Amino acid sequence: MSSTAESQSGGESLWARRAARRARQRSLTRTVVVGRTPLRIAVRPGTGSGPPLLLANGIGASLETFEPFLAALDPAIEVIRFDVPGVGGSPLPARPYRFGTLAHLLAGLLDHLGHEQADILGISWGGALAQQFALSERRRCRRVVLVATGTGVLMVPANPWVLATLATPRRYLDRGYTRRIAGQLYGGTARQDPEQVAGVLHRWTRVGPSRGYLYQLAAGSGWTSLPLLPLLRQPTLVLTGDDDPIIPHVNGRILASLIPHARLHTYHGGHVELVLRPALLAPLISEFLTETEPGPPSAGR
C-alpha cells in the first residue's frame, strides 16, 4: 500500500473511531473526567452534520436550566451542556478557577468527545466564559452567541440592589423569595409572571454547594474582555433585552460595536427570556448557527 493510501486509510480509521466514540457517548446525562476534573455533561445528538453547540449557563444554574431552550432549538444542532465545577452535579474543585482555566477545560471536553471544533452560546455569566473560549481557544471555536451578557468589570453596571441580590444563591434555594424578587431582578416576562421564573429555577436547576457559587463569583473578579474584543474574530450574534436589570441594554451595543463580525438583535424582554420564552430567540439562534455563511455585521435595533 502506498504512503498516500496508508494516510487516507489512517484518516478514515481515525474519523471512524471518533464517530463510534461519539455514538457510544450519546447518553442523556453523565459525568466525564477531563484531565483531572470531573464534569457532569449532557449531549443531545443532532440530525445535521455541523459542529456541536456548547451551552454556557448563568451563575448558579445547572445544565437542566437550558431544557426549555433545547426543546425549541433546531434538532439538526448537536448540543453539549455542562455543569461548571462546583455547580449542579459537577464536584467542587480543590481551588477557585479563572475563566481562562474553564475555557481550556472546554477545549479538553471537546477532545474527550471527539470534536475538533464547536460553536458556543453563553448567557449572562456564561457569556463571559463564551467570550474567553472564543479568544483563548480560537481554533476550536467557530461561531459565538452572546445572550444577556457584558464585558465583565468594565461595563455599564446594574443598580446596587441587583448586584447585592446576585451576590448570593438564595434565589435558587427559596422559591417564595424567588417569586418576590423575580420581576425586579430579571425584568421582562418575570414582571408579569414571577411564578414562571420560580418554576424554571426550582424545577430545572440542580443546586450545587454554596462554595461553588462563590467560586463562580471569584472567576469574574477583575475579569474583562473589553480591550480584547477586536481580537474576537468569529462570527458573533449578540442578543440583548430592552428590559434587563442585570445587564443593561447598552452593554449589548458595546459588545456588538467592538466585535468585528458581530450582529446585534434587541428583543423585547428581560434577562432570562431565553428559557422563559425560548420560541422568541431559538429560531434566530438556529438560523445563525446553521446558515452556510453568516451575513454581514448589523447594528440591529
Regions found by a protein language model. Name each.
Residues 131, 135, 141-171:
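Flexible "cap/lid" loop of the alpha/beta hydrolase fold
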Residues 37-91:
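Conserved HGGG/HGGXW glycine-rich cap/lid loop of the alpha/beta-hydrolase fold
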Residues 175-228:
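Conserved alpha/beta-hydrolase catalytic His-Asp/Glu region
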Residues 1-53, 76-77, 290-301:
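Alpha/beta-hydrolase fold catalytic core
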Residues 243-247:
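Acidic catalytic loop of the alpha/beta-hydrolase fold
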Residues 269-282:
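Catalytic histidine-centered segment of alpha/beta-hydrolase-like enzymes
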